[in-house]
UniProtKB/Swiss-Prot annotation:
It comes from the Bacteria. It comes from Aromatoleum aromaticum (strain DSM 19018 / LMG 30748 / EbN1). Coiled coil: none annotated. Disulfide bonds: none annotated. One of the primary rRNA binding proteins, it binds directly to 16S rRNA where it helps nucleate assembly of the platform of the 30S subunit by binding and bridging several RNA helices of the 16S rRNA. Signal peptide: none annotated. GO terms for molecular function: rRNA binding; structural constituent of ribosome. This is Small ribosomal subunit protein uS15. Keywords: Ribonucleoprotein, Ribosomal protein, RNA-binding, rRNA-binding. Part of the 30S ribosomal subunit. Forms a bridge to the 50S subunit in the 70S ribosome, contacting the 23S rRNA. GO terms for biological process: translation. Belongs to the universal ribosomal protein uS15 family. GO terms for cellular component: cytosolic small ribosomal subunit.
């Protein structure tokens, strides 16, 4: 579901490259991950909500594209980000 302002600003502060950075791939991936984690809990209670599932799949795809971009541009930042977010097992 949607993130509240406080949690969104906390995520931005944790992952921004410089003060005022809200659009870097690291910040975008962190925000998408928080939204994906929230929706994953939603599907435990609402298994037949296929409309929201499509939105979840679009978010996962967008996150994957951003991670692929980041991996090509800055591999060290990519590895650091997936470790901090716990995306790879």
């Amino acid at each position: 579901m949607a993130l509240d302002t406080a949690s969104k600003s906390q995520i931005v502060n944790d992952f921004q490259r410089a003060q005022g950075d809200t659009g870097s791939p690291e910040v975008q991936v962190a925000l998408l991950t928080a939204r994906i984690n929230g929706l994953t809990g939603h599907f435990k209670a609402n298994a037949k909500d296929h409309h929201s599932r499509r939105g979840l799949l679009k978010m996962v795809s967008q996150r994957r594209k951003l991670l692929d971009y980041l991996k090509g541009k800055n591999a060290d930042s990519y590895r650091n980000l997936i470790e901090r977010l716990g995306l790879r097992k």
